[in-house]
């Protein structure tokens, strides 16, 4: 169970870092939002799911 928690936290940190870089780049590019909004929404959904997963796993471990 601890390994799953550690992997979920690592995935959350990695996803946060990727979104931290990619979202401003998408908004700054001339036609970026209209062509990449599905990717941004998918990344945001993944991030939100990982937040809940880490919370659930944290409550099971402690």
From Swiss-Prot:
<keyword id="KW-0602">Photosynthesis</keyword>
<keyword id="KW-0604">Photosystem II</keyword>
<keyword id="KW-0674">Reaction center</keyword>
<comment type="function">
    <text>May control the interaction of photosystem II (PSII) cores with the light-harvesting antenna, regulates electron flow through the 2 photosystem reaction centers. PSII is a light-driven water plastoquinone oxidoreductase, using light energy to abstract electrons from H(2)O, generating a proton gradient subsequently used for ATP formation.</text>
</comment>
<dbReference type="InterPro" id="IPR002644">
    <property type="entry name" value="PSII_PsbZ"/>
</dbReference>
<keyword id="KW-0472">Membrane</keyword>
<keyword id="KW-0934">Plastid</keyword>
<keyword id="KW-0150">Chloroplast</keyword>
<keyword id="KW-0812">Transmembrane</keyword>
<comment type="subunit">
    <text>PSII is composed of 1 copy each of membrane proteins PsbA, PsbB, PsbC, PsbD, PsbE, PsbF, PsbH, PsbI, PsbJ, PsbK, PsbL, PsbM, PsbT, PsbY, PsbZ, Psb30/Ycf12, at least 3 peripheral proteins of the oxygen-evolving complex and a large number of cofactors. It forms dimeric complexes.</text>
</comment>
<keyword id="KW-0793">Thylakoid</keyword>
<dbReference type="GO" id="GO:0009539">
    <property type="term" value="C:photosystem II reaction center"/>
</dbReference>
<dbReference type="InterPro" id="IPR036512">
    <property type="entry name" value="PSII_PsbZ_sf"/>
</dbReference>
<keyword id="KW-1133">Transmembrane helix</keyword>
<feature type="transmembrane region" description="Helical">
    <location>
        <begin position="41"/>
        <end position="61"/>
    </location>
</feature>
<protein>
    <recommendedName>
        <fullName>Photosystem II reaction center protein Z</fullName>
    </recommendedName>
</protein>
<feature type="transmembrane region" description="Helical">
    <location>
        <begin position="8"/>
        <end position="28"/>
    </location>
</feature>
<comment type="similarity">
    <text>Belongs to the PsbZ family.</text>
</comment>
<dbReference type="GO" id="GO:0042549">
    <property type="term" value="P:photosystem II stabilization"/>
</dbReference>
<dbReference type="GO" id="GO:0009535">
    <property type="term" value="C:chloroplast thylakoid membrane"/>
</dbReference>
<dbReference type="GO" id="GO:0015979">
    <property type="term" value="P:photosynthesis"/>
</dbReference>
<dbReference type="Pfam" id="PF01737">
    <property type="entry name" value="Ycf9"/>
</dbReference>
């Amino acid at each position: 169970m601890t390994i799953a928690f550690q992997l979920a936290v690592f995935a959350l940190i990695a996803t946060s870092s990727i979104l931290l870089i990619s979202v401003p780049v998408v908004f700054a590019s001339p036609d970026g939002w209209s062509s990449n909004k599905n990717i941004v929404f998918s990344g945001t959904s993944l991030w939100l799911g990982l937040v809940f997963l880490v919370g659930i796993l944290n409550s099971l471990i402690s």
